[in-house]
UniProtKB/Swiss-Prot annotation:
Biological role stated in the UniProt entry: Required for assembly and stability of the aminoacyl-tRNA synthase complex. Mediates ubiquitination and degradation of FUBP1, a transcriptional activator of MYC, leading to MYC down-regulation which is required for aveolar type II cell differentiation. Blocks MDM2-mediated ubiquitination and degradation of p53/TP53. Functions as a proapoptotic factor.
Name of this chain's protein: Aminoacyl tRNA synthase complex-interacting multifunctional protein 2
Phosphoserine sites (modified residues): 36
Domain GST C-terminal: 220-317
Single GO MF annotation: molecular adaptor activity
Organism, as annotated: Bos taurus
Gene Ontology biological-process annotations: apoptotic process; negative regulation of cell population proliferation; positive regulation of protein ubiquitination; protein ubiquitination; protein-containing complex assembly; translation; type II pneumocyte differentiation
Post-translational modification: Phosphorylated on serine residues in response to UV irradiation.
Subunit record text: Part of the multisynthetase complex (MSC), a multisubunit complex that groups tRNA ligases for Arg (RARS1), Asp (DARS1), Gln (QARS1), Ile (IARS1), Leu (LARS1), Lys (KARS1), Met (MARS1) the bifunctional ligase for Glu and Pro (EPRS1) and the auxiliary subunits AIMP1/p43, AIMP2/p38 and EEF1E1/p18. Interacts (via N-terminus) with KARS1. Interacts with EPRS1. Forms a linear complex that contains MARS1, EEF1E1, EPRS1 and AIMP2 that is at the core of the multisubunit complex. Binds FUBP1 (via C-terminus).
Region (Interaction with PRKN): 82-162
């Protein structure tokens, strides 16, 4: 049934002469024809152009893919924000096997830039009142991957630093020329509100916060992760800093429930390999003393697994 029907605007059988101005497109006068039937009322329902049909089909495909992507993002958001959510993301994105931490390294020149023979020196300012245990763990792991020239200093504004913090890197006996090392790691005990890292004044800004510095240092191991795992790792690091370390008691209880659920499925927080999420969460738990009797069984088992590793065990001695 047509939406509307146009009636003739004049009566009579005689043709109507209309003076038309000069225009770009001229159309035949539909009222000038005689003896022919009136145009069909459903003339607007003619067959569509094939190119238009193809365009509409392509648009439908794009909308369908957008709906699927939106559903995937909504599912990931629910899983990250809800501690007790049980969502199987393997159906959303096929996860690749992560590279083993002990066997993969990266080209430091590609990661940190070519310094034409100069030693790549990472300088970290940390407050001795709150030693960043995660960075000490990562330092030990870096020493297992690269030739690291380590040194510890005390800023002149700091009156005293415990002896164990001054020896946090162990006895440093430099037996090789400086240029034969691959990486420099300098720790300065300084009265700063947040842990700071400076690498290259010319090419990068200082990085602040234990979690952000840990992310940078862990990237030097070259561990490969898929997009889903990378999102989960970043989420765990943020949870450690903003909820477990600075949050209320309810937020901390929610973090423990979420950790207990994740560790009930895999030995580490994200998959079967140690990640920066494990390092930072372990560090925050030890700094805040939140690993006592209130921790669930899976979390306590995970804590013990961390401290069975030499880098964690060495860092733990600094709190004794």
């Amino acid at each position: 049934m047509p939406m509307y029907q146009v009636k003739p605007y004049h009566e009579g059988s005689g043709s109507l002469r209309v003076e038309l101005p000069t225009c770009m497109y001229r159309l035949p006068n539909v009222h000038g024809r005689t003896g022919s039937p009136a145009p069909s009322a459903d003339h607007v329902q003619e067959a569509s152009d094939p190119s238009l049909q193809a365009l509409e089909s392509h648009q439908d495909d794009i909308l369908k893919r957008l709906y699927e992507l939106k559903a995937a993002v909504d599912g990931l958001s629910k899983m990250i924000q809800t501690p007790d959510a049980d969502l199987d993301v393997t159906n959303i994105i096929q996860a690749d096997e992560p590279a083993a931490l002990s066997t993969s390294t990266v080209d430091l020149n590609a990661m940190l830039g070519q310094d034409h023979g100069a030693l790549k020196d990472i300088v970290i300012n940390a407050n001795p009142a709150s030693p960043p245990l995660s960075l000490l763990v990562l330092h030990r792991l870096l020493c297992d991957h690269y030739k690291v020239l380590s040194s510890v200093h005390t800023h002149s504004a700091v009156r005293s630093v415990p002896a164990n913090l001054l020896q946090c890197f162990g006895e440093q006996t430099r037996q090789q020329p400086r240029h034969e090392y691959q990486l420099g790691f300098t720790l300065i005990w300084k009265d700063v509100p947040k842990t700071q890292m400076k690498f290259s004044v010319q090419t990068m800004c200082p990085i602040e916060g234990e979690g952000n510095i840990a992310r940078f240092l862990f990237s030097l191991f070259g561990q490969k992760q898929d997009a889903v795992n990378l999102t989960l790792i970043d989420s765990w690091v943020d949870i450690a800093i903003f909820q477990l370390k600075e949050g209320s008691s309810k937020e901390k209880a929610a973090v423990f429930r979420s950790m207990n659920s994740a560790l009930g499925k895999t030995p580490w927080l994200v998959g079967d390999e140690l990640t920066v999420a494990d390092v930072v969460l372990w560090s925050v738990l030890r700094q805040t003393g939140g690993c006592g009797g209130m921790a669930p069984a899976n979390v306590q088992k995970w804590m013990q697994a961390c401290e069975n590793l030499a880098p964690f065990h060495t860092a733990l001695k600094l709190l004794q």
